[in-house]
C-alpha cells in the first residue's frame, strides 16, 4: 500500500496527509488505509479548486474557458483541508467574518467565494445518497455538501456548485484508483475503513475457544480440525472421475444434423386453451404514470419529494370513494384500500418518520405471523401428519401480445431523460476523441429512451428498499416509488409513481424474503387486457387532465416479495447499459477496421460514402422490419432491461440450454455439417424452462419466427447451389 500511495499521489499531498495523521497521533505505517483515504480526499479538494475560477467581476470560468486570461482570474474555491488545524480554524473564522456569515461548528474542506458558503467534501465506498444524508444530519445547513462515490454516483446539496466536467474528473479519478487497487488486490484492505469503530485484536480465552469448538458442524471434533479439512479439500475433479467410471455404460449414436431435423421450441405457447402469461415484473413499466412536480434539482428526502407531489395532485391524494375495477384471486380489497390510505396519511403528515402502524390489515398484507413454524426432527418423525410438501411445478402459459407491446413502448424515444451519467474530462490522446464521439452518439440514443427512465426507477426504488430493510428490520415502512427526470428544455421534475410498504425484514440469509406491497399509479384501464393483470387489484381513484384531455387514474395494488439478492441486482441495473453499448460498439469497430477510419458517425447518420446502417429489429405481417442503428441500440438496451426485470431460474435455464441450439444453427449456416446425439433430449431441456416467465415465452416465440426465416433462407441457398452445379 505504501508503494501504491507513493506512485499515485504527489509528494505534497502525501506530506500533508501524514501531517494530518500526526496531529491525531496516528502512524501512517500502521494505518496505510487511513493515509490513502486522506490522500484521496485531499486530491479531490484540489481537483475541484483547480477546475474553477472567478474573474474580477465574479463571473465563473472553468480551467478550459480561462486559458489566456490567467492574470485576471483567481480560484473560486479556497482549500482549507490539509492545513494544520489551528491555522485552518483561523482561516475559516476570518473568511466567515470577511463575508458576514456565521462560522460553522465543524471545520470545512472548501470555501466558495461565489456563493459565500463553506463546503464539506465526502468520499464514500457505499452509496452517495446514504453518505449525503448521514453528513446532512450531522452538519445541517451550516455548509454545502459534495459527496462522491467509488460506485460512480454523486450527491450535491447545490447542483450548480460544480459543473459536469468537474464531476466527471472527480469520478474518473476515483474509478482509476479503484481499478488500480483491485489489480493489486488492495481494494479489500479499504473496505470497512469508513466511519466505523476500529477493531481491537485480543487473544481468545478458554471459554470462547471452547464455545467455538462445540459450534462446528457435525462430523468435526473442533475448529482447527474443520479449518484443516477446508484448507485441504479438493472441490474439483469429483464429477469428472465418476463420469469416467460410467463411460463403458454410456451409449451415444451421433447423427448428422439437417435443417429438417430442427423444429420450433415450446409448442404449448401457441395453445389457446392455456391462459395468457400474466404480468409479473416487480414494478409497472410502460403502464406507469408519474405525478410530476417541477423542482430546482436539489437533493431531497424521498418522503419530502412524495409529499410535494401528492400536495400538487390533492384530488388523487384525498380520494376516499374508489371504484373497484379488478380484484386478484387472494386479495382483500378493503384491507388494501385501508393500507393505501394509511400510506398517504403517513407521507402527508409533518413527522419525519415514514413508519406505519401495525394494524390488522397491514399485518394481513405483509404476511406477518404467517411464516412456517420450525419443528425439531425428532418430533416430526413421531407425527404421521408431518410430511414434505409436494414441489410446486409452474403452470404452463401461452404467449401474450402485451410483452411485445411493452418491448415496443420501452424502446421508443421520449421527451424526458432520467439517466444520470457523469461527464468525462477533456480529450488528450486521439483515441479519446473517438471514444468521446462514440459515447455522445450512444448516450443521445439511450438518454431519451423510455427504458432508461424505467431502469433508473428500479435502481432508486431497490436502493431505498434495501436501505430500509437493513435499517428498520422490525418496522413497517412506506417507501415512495420516485424518479427525477429532465425535459428537453433542461427543466427538472420530481416524479412520484406510487408508494410501497415494506413488512418485517429480518433478512439473515440472502434468499430470505421480505414482503413488499406496491401501490402504483397508471392511466391504463386493466379491462382492456384483463389477462395481463391477474396478480393485481385495481381501483379507479380519479382523473387528470393531460394535454386538454381527461384521463382516468387507476391505482394498481399488489402483494409481492423480494430478497437481498434481487434488491442488490436492482441497485446495479445500470449494468444493462454496458452490454447493449458493447454489442453495438463491436459492430462499429468491425466496420471501422474494414473501412480504415472511424465509422461511428457513418453507422448512426451516414456519410458521403456510406448510407446509415440498418438492422432487422422485428417482424410485421410475416416480414422483417428494418430499423436504424440507433433504434437497434435502443432495442438491445431494452432487451437487456427486460432480461433483468423478468430474470429468474426459468430464464437462466432457457438461456443456457438454448445456447447449444443456437450454436448448431450457426454451424448449419456456416455449412460445417454439425453432428448431434439426443437432439430431442436437448429440446426437452429447453422446453422444461418455458413455463410462465413472460420473457422466456416471448423469446421462444421470437426464436421460432427466426428459425422459420433461416429455414426459408437455407432453401434458397440450396436451390442456388443446384443451379450452380448444373
Curated annotation (Swiss-Prot):
It is an enzyme of class 3 (hydrolase). A motif (Nuclear localization signal 2 (NLS2)) lies at residues 183-244. It is found in: Host cytoplasm; Host nucleus. Phosphorylated on serines and threonines by host kinases, including human casein kinase II. InterPro entries: INFV_PA, PA/PA-X, PA/PA-X_sf. One of its GO terms (biological process) is symbiont-mediated suppression of host gene expression. Mn(2+) 2 binds at residues 81, 109. Mn(2+) 1 binds at residues 41, 109, 120-121. Its cofactor is Mn(2+). GO terms for molecular function: endonuclease activity; metal ion binding; RNA binding. It comes from the Viruses. A motif (Nuclear localization signal 1 (NLS1)) lies at residues 125-140. One of its GO terms (cellular component) is host cell nucleus. Binds 2 manganese ions per subunit. Keywords: Cap snatching, Endonuclease, Eukaryotic host gene expression shutoff by virus, Eukaryotic host transcription shutoff by virus, Host cytoplasm, Host gene expression shutoff by virus, Host nucleus, Host-virus interaction, Hydrolase, Inhibition of host RNA polymerase II by virus, Manganese, Metal-binding, Nuclease, Phosphoprotein. Its EC number is 3.1.-.-. Plays an essential role in viral RNA transcription and replication by forming the heterotrimeric polymerase complex together with PB1 and PB2 subunits. The complex transcribes viral mRNAs by using a unique mechanism called cap-snatching. It consists in the hijacking and cleavage of host capped pre-mRNAs. These short capped RNAs are then used as primers for viral mRNAs. The PB2 subunit is responsible for the binding of the 5' cap of cellular pre-mRNAs which are subsequently cleaved after 10-13 nucleotides by the PA subunit that carries the endonuclease activity. Belongs to the influenza viruses PA family. Influenza RNA polymerase is composed of three subunits: PB1, PB2 and PA. Interacts (via C-terminus) with PB1 (via N-terminus). This is Polymerase acidic protein. It comes from Influenza B virus (strain B/Panama/45/1990). The gene is PA.
Amino acid at each position: 500500500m505504501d508503494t501504491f500511495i507513493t506512485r499515485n499521489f504527489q509528494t505534497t499531498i502525501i506530506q500533508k496527509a501524514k501531517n494530518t495523521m500526526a496531529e491525531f497521533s496516528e502512524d501512517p505505517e500502521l494505518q496505510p488505509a487511513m493515509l490513502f483515504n486522506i490522500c484521496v480526499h485531499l486530491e479531490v479538494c484540489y481537483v475541484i479548486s483547480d477546475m474553477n475560477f472567478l474573474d474580477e467581476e465574479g463571473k465563473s470560468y472553468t480551467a478550459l474557458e480561462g486559458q489566456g486570461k490567467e492574470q485576471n482570474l483567481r480560484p473560486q474555491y479556497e482549500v482549507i483541508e490539509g492545513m494544520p488545524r489551528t491555522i485552518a480554524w483561523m482561516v475559516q473564522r476570518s473568511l466567515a467574518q470577511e463575508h458576514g456569515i456565521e462560522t460553522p461548528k465543524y471545520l470545512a474542506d472548501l470555501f466558495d467565494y461565489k456563493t459565500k458558503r463553506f463546503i464539506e467534501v465526502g468520499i464514500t465506498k457505499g452509496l452517495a445518497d446514504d453518505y449525503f444524508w448521514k453528513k446532512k444530519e450531522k452538519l445541517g445547513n451550516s455548509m454545502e455538501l459534495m459527496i462522491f462515490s467509488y460506485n460512480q454516483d454523486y450527491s450535491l446539496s447545490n447542483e450548480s456548485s460544480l459543473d459536469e466536467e468537474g464531476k466527471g474528473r472527480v469520478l474518473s479519478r476515483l474509478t482509476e484508483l479503484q481499478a488500480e487497487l483491485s489489480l493489486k488486490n488492495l481494494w479489500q484492505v479499504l473496505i470497512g475503513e469508513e466511519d466505523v469503530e476500529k477493531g481491537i485484536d485480543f487473544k481468545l480465552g478458554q471459554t470462547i475457544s471452547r464455545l467455538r469448538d462445540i459450534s462446528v458442524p457435525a462430523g468435526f471434533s473442533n475448529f482447527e480440525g474443520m479449518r484443516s479439512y477446508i484448507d485441504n479439500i479438493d472441490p474439483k475433479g469429483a464429477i469428472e472421475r465418476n463420469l469416467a467410471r460410467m463411460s463403458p455404460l454410456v451409449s451415444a449414436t451421433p447423427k448428422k444434423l439437417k435443417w429438417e431435423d430442427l423444429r420450433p421450441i415450446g409448442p404449448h405457447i401457441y395453445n389457446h386453451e392455456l391462459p395468457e402469461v400474466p404480468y409479473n415484473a416487480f414494478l409497472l413499466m410502460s403502464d406507469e404514470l408519474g405525478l410530476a412536480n417541477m423542482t430546482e434539482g436539489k437533493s431531497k428526502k424521498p418522503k419530502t419529494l412524495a409529499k410535494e407531489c401528492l400536495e400538487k395532485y390533492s384530488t388523487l391524494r384525498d380520494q376516499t370513494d374508489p371504484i373497484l375495477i379488478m380484484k386478484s384471486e387472494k386479495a382483500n380489497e378493503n384491507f388494501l384500500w385501508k393500507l393505501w390510505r394509511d400510506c398517504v396519511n403517513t407521507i402527508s403528515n409533518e413527522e419525519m418518520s415514514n413508519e406505519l402502524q401495525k394494524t390488522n390489515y397491514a399485518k394481513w398484507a405483509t404476511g406477518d405471523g404467517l411464516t412456517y413454524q420450525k419443528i425439531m426432527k425428532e418430533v416430526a418423525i413421531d407425527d404421521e401428519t408431518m410430511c414434505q410438501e409436494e414441489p410446486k411445478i409452474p403452470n404452463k402459459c401461452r404467449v401474450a401480445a402485451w410483452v411485445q407491446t411493452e418491448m415496443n413502448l420501452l424502446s421508443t424515444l421520449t421527451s424526458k431523460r432520467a439517466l444520470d451519467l457523469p461527464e468525462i474530462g477533456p480529450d488528450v490522446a486521439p483515441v479519446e476523441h473517438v471514444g468521446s464521439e462514440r459515447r455522445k452518439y450512444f448516450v443521445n440514443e439511450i438518454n431519451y429512451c423510455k427504458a432508461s427512465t424505467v431502469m433508473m426507477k428500479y435502481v432508486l426504488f431497490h436502493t431505498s428498499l434495501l436501505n430500509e430493510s437493513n435499517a428498520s428490520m422490525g418496522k413497517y415502512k412506506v417507501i415512495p416509488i420516485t424518479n427525477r427526470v429532465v425535459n428537453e428544455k433542461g427543466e427538472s421534475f420530481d416524479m412520484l409513481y406510487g408508494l410501497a410498504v415494506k413488512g418485517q425484514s429480518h433478512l439473515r440469509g440472502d434468499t430470505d424474503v421480505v414482503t413488499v406491497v406496491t401501490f402504483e399509479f397508471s392511466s391504463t384501464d386493466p379491462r382492456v387486457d384483463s389477462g395481463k393483470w391477474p396478480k393485481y387489484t385495481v381501483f379507479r381513484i380519479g382523473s387528470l387532465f393531460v394535454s386538454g384531455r381527461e384521463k382516468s387514474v387507476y391505482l394498481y395494488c399488489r402483494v409481492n416479495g423480494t430478497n437481498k439478492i434481487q434488491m442488490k441486482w436492482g441497485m446495479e441495473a445500470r449494468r444493462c447499459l454496458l452490454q447493449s453499448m458493447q454489442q453495438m460498439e463491436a459492430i462499429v469497430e468491425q466496420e471501422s477496421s474494414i473501412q480504415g477510419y472511424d465509422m461511428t458517425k457513418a453507422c448512426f447518420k451516414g456519410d458521403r460514402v456510406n448510407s446509415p446502417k440498418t438492422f432487422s429489429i422485428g417482424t410485421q405481417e410475416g416480414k422483417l422490419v428494418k430499423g436504424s442503428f440507433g433504434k437497434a441500440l435502443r432495442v438491445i438496451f431494452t432487451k437487456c432491461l427486460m432480461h433483468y426485470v423478468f430474470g429468474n431460474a426459468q430464464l437462466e435455464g432457457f438461456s443456457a440450454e438454448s445456447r447449444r441450439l443456437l450454436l448448431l444453427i450457426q454451424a448449419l449456416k456456416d455449412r460445417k455439417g454439425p453432428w448431434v446425439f439426443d437432439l430431442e433430449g436437448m429440446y426437452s431441456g429447453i422446453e422444461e424452462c418455458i413455463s410462465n416467465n413472460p420473457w422466456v415465452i416471448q423469446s421462444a416465440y421470437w426464436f421460432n419466427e427466426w428459425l422459420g426465416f433461416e429455414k426459408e433462407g437455407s432453401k434458397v441457398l440450396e436451390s442456388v447451389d443446384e443451379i450452380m452445379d448444373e
